[in-house]
Amino acid sequence: MDALKLLTTNVKFKNKVPQPSIKEKEAKKLQGITKGKAKVTGNNPVDPIEEFPEGILCENLKKQNITECTTIQRYAIPTIGSKRDLLACAPTGSGKTIAYLFPILQKLQLHVPGGYRAIIVAPTRELCEQIYRQAEKLSFGTSLKIIELSKSNEKIQEKAPKLREKYDMCIGTPMRLVQAIQTGLSFEKVEFFVMDEADRLFEPGFIEQTDHILSACTSSNICKSLFSATIPSRVEELAKVVTVDPIRIIVGLKDAATDSIDQRLLFVGSDTSKIVILRQMISNGELKPRVVIFVQDIERAKALYTELLFDEIHVGVIHGELPQAKREEALAKFRKGEIWVLIATDLLARGIDFHGVKMVINFDFPQSVHSYIHRIGRTGRAGNTGQAVTFFTKEDGEYIKLIAGVMRSSGCEVPNWVMALPKPSKEMKKKLKKSPPKRKRITTRASYDRQKEQRKKEYIKKVKKEASIKKHNEATGDSGQ
């Protein structure tokens, strides 16, 4: 790698075509998500539809200002409606949720007591909540009953198992669904089974739970659908095992981001420079709310949140250690615009839909191509445009080729010297995915100040402990001698 180029170049990738007018942009946005190319393979694929079938579901979509089918919806709706197993890969923000909810709700038609007839599995509580909200909107005015398995209603169902017969569709994370099965939940009447973010559900930590759930679906008439924005070859092989004669739909290029995102690589030198450069971007007015900033882990999320809080920025944070109520509160404030900048770990990278996210910043370099695609997919959704900026250090340089490949396949222009960089080996990619690099702490305070603050905290802790012991001794009459 040419170190001089890395040290002196901020690489910006723009679409090759001249910038069109605003009116042309709007037309192109709509055309991109509704008339995009799709590669369909499998035995006797079903013909695509051109518009949503008329009826109450279509009317409910119109209330959300959704009047045209996206590409994935044109192909997936008739496929699932014909009860064909499906493996679907489409860019983030292309309407995958409606692509499977619409045909399932249409086929279920009316509420039928006796147990769940449709199961939707998603890797995170936040994504399940989002799917549930869309299902409620779409089924409004029907007699269909939908439930999202969560901590709040789990105990109610355990105490009153017959309540389960009230619902037609169940949405939940693998853990929640496995727990429900263990308490007596039956999936024997399930007609439709959907895996959203299927590649994640086939990863270690989820695959055993996913297998448990699939084993509980014993109906011979079940239709299985797997959706994701990225589907690695390994996942395709596993999908063939759990599906029967599936139709495979790939919208656009496999493992590519949508072309509605302006992607940029920004060399920052070292980890310690990142916060300074981020503040420069803020002061230059480069950050247009709303912004999502991705970091490598929970500790770095907390640290960056503290730094930006001191700058009096409307900032929030979401990570796995936050209680569910706090996570939901942060997401709600971000949606309402009360929070302008949301700091997140990869917990937020998958599936969650925010309207109006203008920019994504990868403060820490993503650990895989799939992580990159899902992260930047929080912007440029539903035909809107967005920006994605990825910080990289000298240590990250050997992995740039991975990201550059995604950029080029997404229709962006990439300098030849970047494409000439060697590809990281399989071993290097596995190492990065398994164990992210150790990074220096996020702070602009001097080491002396940090040590001073730590000593102060330790002193306060010691004083409180001594006071507690003294109070206990006085209460028990123990002199401590």
From Swiss-Prot:
Coiled-coil stretches: none
Motif (DEAD box): 196-199
Biased composition (Basic and acidic residues): 447-475
Region: Disordered, residue numbers: 425-481
Record GO terms (molecular function): ATP binding; ATP hydrolysis activity; RNA binding; RNA helicase activity
InterPro entries named in the record: DDX52/Rok1_DEADc, DEAD/DEAH_box_helicase_dom, DEAD_box_RNA_helicase, Helicase_ATP-bd, Helicase_C-like, P-loop_NTPase, RNA-helicase_DEAD-box_CS
Protein name stated in the entry: ATP-dependent RNA helicase rok1
Organism: Schizosaccharomyces pombe (strain 972 / ATCC 24843) (Fission yeast)
Encoding gene, per UniProt annotation: rok1
